[in-house]
Swiss-Prot record:
It comes from Syntrophomonas wolfei subsp. wolfei (strain DSM 2245B / Goettingen). One of its GO terms (molecular function) is structural constituent of ribosome. The keyword Ribonucleoprotein applies. This is Large ribosomal subunit protein bL35. InterPro entries: Ribosomal_bL35 (IPR001706), Ribosomal_bL35-like (IPR021137), Ribosomal_bL35_CS (IPR018265), Ribosomal_bL35_sf (IPR037229).
Length: 64
């Protein structure tokens, strides 16, 4: 049985944690930042976690 290929687009966007949860970066932080408050931009730098509903599907894209 061949190994499952990793979805390269998903591998660049998500990382698995040691406990098996999936870490993600937040959207709306790349451009058009002048109209956003410093507090909002600061919070966009923090990492988020993928919801339980989507974890199973993304785990199949990044198996290793």
């Amino acid at each position: 049985m061949p190994k499952i290929k990793t979805h390269r687009g998903a591998a660049k966007r998500f990382k698995k944690t040691g406990t098996g949860k999936i870490k993600r970066s937040k959207a709306y932080a790349s451009h058009l930042l002048g109209g956003k408050s410093p507090k909002r931009k600061r919070n966009l730098r923090k990492a988020g976690l993928v919801s339980e509903a989507e974890t199973r599907g993304i785990s199949r894209l990044i198996p290793y």
